Regions:
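Surface-exposed binding/hinge segments that line
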Residues: 80, 126-168
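Extracytoplasmic/peripheral linker and loop segments enriched in polar/acidic and small residues
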Residues: 389-397, 419-453
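Ligand/substrate-recognition segments at binding pockets and active sites
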Residues: 343-411, 451-452
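Append "and occasionally in soluble cytosolic enzymes with long acidic Gly/Pro-rich linkers
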Residues: 280-376
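Ligand-site clamp/hinge motif
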Residues: 204-250, 378, 387-389
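Gly/Pro-rich hinge or "lid" segments in bacterial periplasmic/extracellular proteins
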Residues: 66, 70, 159-212, 216, ...
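Aromatic- and charge-enriched surface segment that lines or borders ligand/interaction sites
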Residues: 77-122, 144, 278
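N-terminal lobe/hinge region of extracytoplasmic solute-binding protein
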Residues: 37-81, 114, 183
């Protein structure tokens, strides 16, 4: 079962952040506004959803990450760890306040993590806190977490945004109106939300870590990648994350600054193993792997700014290099199909037990990189005799799809990605992948600080 899941059409990305007008001086008395080209939001709910760009501006966790991805204080000024009892004790800043003026307390922390852990709430982040055995409020500004076992990523997970108990207790954690008008502790607070157009944040003058230097940050909703580049060029945006193709137009323009960053972010085809087709044809997945020319996809879509990926942790110290590499080999792909009993039809496609061999790749609308990758992958697989097509559904339906062009990568410790994406029945395991050996290794890895484990 393991083969084929982690290696499908895998490519690691280099992303380009482009900003405009960086050399224009601003008078001290003028209001400063930064307009960022953002994807759309239906809610701002850090506890239930994956990390969002806007979350860290509105909320704080007990811990935070610095520019080198190291854990630093957030709402907690310090913390202790008792190795004998596996207990973390966090000592919180006493001057932190909610944006409605109420003090932030240890009860808020306990409320937030318990809400995430509650299976009734269906949080994607629940696997991160499976090891929490007890949460004890020592006093208003001290909270202790007793773990069942070691979890080397626990301090990373405490970057989770703390939510206000006094506003959310008794509310539905998925549908509450709070998540359309959130109140946080962070450097910015919501000024307005024009649905489908923009979310405007204004600085929090009472922020406990100091007043921000930029007065307003506008998340302008521009879901289409090409449109972001056009609006950056026209001056409608100050900052945008662009595809390599779109960023190339700004590289030699002195009016813009381009930041190219190597990432652990990857794109790949993930199969829905709950789908009847893959339950019958799982043995054909290696043929898909050999039928994909990853380097050709990188050159065409990313202008060479990437590398073939053969696992989810390739640019991570936890990467294991000796995995099987399904390098491009169309002839071997055909051999696998024929060995499985597939026969070539008059239309140029293989058939198995009278059924055409092929599947549909679903892709999110507006993400041109994924769309382009999926279309090239589909064409490459057609060339080896698999009838593969691409669809762009209006809404994501994980259970109803055969396969999807995914984008993932751990923002900090590898556990944050692998445990909940590939662990059986975990919060972000949309593929339905299940392997008892993998579950065992994932559990062992989160309990060890040794990168070799």
């Amino acid at each position: 079962m393991k083969k084929g899941l982690l290696t499908m059409a895998g490519v690691l990305l280099t992303v380009s952040l482009v900003s405009a007008g960086t050399t224009v001086p601003v008078l001290a008395e003028e209001e400063t506004t930064l307009v960022y080209g953002s994807g759309d939001y239906t809610r701002i709910n850090p506890a239930m959803d994956e990390h969002g760009e806007i979350n860290i501006l509105i909320f704080n966790g007990l811990t935070a990450h610095d520019g080198d991805n190291q854990v630093v204080p957030g709402l907690a000024e310090s913390w202790d760890f008792d190795d004998e009892t596996n207990t973390y004790t966090f000592h919180m800043a006493e001057d932190a306040k909610w944006q409605d003026g109420e003090p932030v307390t240890a009860e808020d922390v306990k409320f937030t993590i318990e809400a995430i852990m509650d299976p009734e709430n269906g949080s994607e982040n629940a696997p991160n806190y499976e090891d929490v055995e007890e949460i004890n409020v020592i006093d208003d500004h001290t909270v202790a977490f007793k773990l069942e076992d070691k979890n080397v990523a626990f301090l990373d997970y405490m970057t989770m945004a703390v939510l206000p108990k006094h506003l959310l207790e008794g509310e539905d954690m998925q549908t509450s109106d709070f998540f359309r008008n959130p109140v946080g502790t962070g450097p910015y607070k919501i000024e307005s939300w024009d649905e489908g157009q923009a979310i405007t944040l204004v600085k929090n003058e009472d922020y406990f870590k100091g007043e921000p230097s930029i007065d307003k940050v506008v998340f302008k909703i521009v879901p289409d990648d090409n449109a972001k580049a056009l609006q950056l060029k026209s001056g409608e945006l100050d900052l945008a994350l662009l595809t390599p193709k779109d960023a190339a137009a700004f590289a030699d323009d002195e009016a813009y600054t381009c930041y190219d960053m190597k990432t652990s972010d990857y794109r790949g085809i993930m199969f829905n193993f709950g789908n009847e087709y893959w339950q019958k044809n799982r043995d054909l997945i290696p043929a898909v792997c050999y039928g994909l020319d990853r380097q050709a996809i990188i050159d065409a879509v990313l202008l060479g700014q990437g590398m073939p990926a053969y696992g989810p942790l390739q640019r991570n110290i936890y990467n294991y290099e000796d995995v099987e590499h399904y390098d491009y080999n169309p002839e071997k792909a055909k051999e696998i199909l024929e060995a499985a009993g597939c026969e070539m039809g008059d239309d140029g496609f293989y058939y198995r037990d009278g059924e055409k061999v092929g599947f549909v790749i679903s892709v999110s609308a507006g993400d041109q990189v994924r769309i382009d990758m999926a279309q090239i992958a589909a064409q490459e697989l057609k060339e080896i005799g698999m009838d593969v097509s691409v669809e762009i559904p209006a809404q994501t339906d994980w259970a109803g799809q055969m396969a999807f062009l995914i984008g993932w990568g751990s923002p900090f410790d590898a556990d944050d990605h692998t445990y909940k994406v590939f662990g059986t029945d975990k919060g972000a395991n949309y593929s339905g992948y299940s392997n008892a050996d993998v579950d065992k290794y994932l559990t062992e890895a989160r309990q060890s600080a040794d990168p070799e484990v």
